[in-house]
Design a protein with these regions (language model features):
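Acyl-donor-binding surface of acyltransferase catalytic domains
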Residues: 1-22
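Sequence-level detector for tyrosine residue identity
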Residues: 3, 13, 34-40, 52, ...
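A conserved beta-strand-loop-helix scaffold within acyl/acetyltransferase catalytic domains
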Residues: 18-95
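Acyl-donor binding region in acyl/amide transferases
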Residues: 70-71, 76-135
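Patatin-like phospholipase
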Residues: 138
Length: 139
């Protein structure tokens, strides 16, 4: 398995006006979106959302009008690195392309906060379309 990250110094994305940090996120709403996402993607195996991860991470909400339709859970690893733990979207309006918009917004957000790296977990070819994306090598 290969892993990837984004070097935020090599990005120039803009913040999304329809995104914001969720303070005290509604777990029920997040679980509904997560369930919709997993069903839409037809994942054969999923982990549940854990309150601990949510309470100790940033939760960024993405809105369509005033409706929460997607979220990302991002953990702070150290002074220069964050990791995307989970993204989920209900796909009620696929034309929003929230997967891409979330990636771009999060790059802009964490770069503005002074972070250098955004770790994305396992490598998938579509991630190569994100500016600054790099596949990690061996230690």
């Amino acid at each position: 398995m290969k892993y990837g990250r984004i070097d935020l110094t090599k990005t120039n994305y803009k913040l999304d006006d329809n995104a914001s940090i969720l303070i005290n996120p509604n777990m029920e709403a997040l679980n509904i979106i997560y369930t919709d996402y997993c069903r839409y993607k037809r994942f054969s195996s999923v982990e549940p959302l854990f309150n601990y991860e949510i309470l100790n991470s940033d939760v960024i909400g993405y809105f369509d009008n005033s409706d929460l339709v997607a979220f990302s859970i991002i953990s702070h690893l150290d002074e220069i690195s964050v990791r995307g733990i989970q993204f989920a979207w209900n796909y009620k309006n696929p034309s929003l392309q929230l997967g891409w918009k979330a990636n771009f917004h999060e790059c802009a957000w964490y770069k503005a906060l002074g972070y250098k790296y955004y770790y994305l977990g396992g490598h998938h070819p579509y991630k190569e379309n994100i500016s600054g994306y790099e596949i990690l090598g061996p230690i």
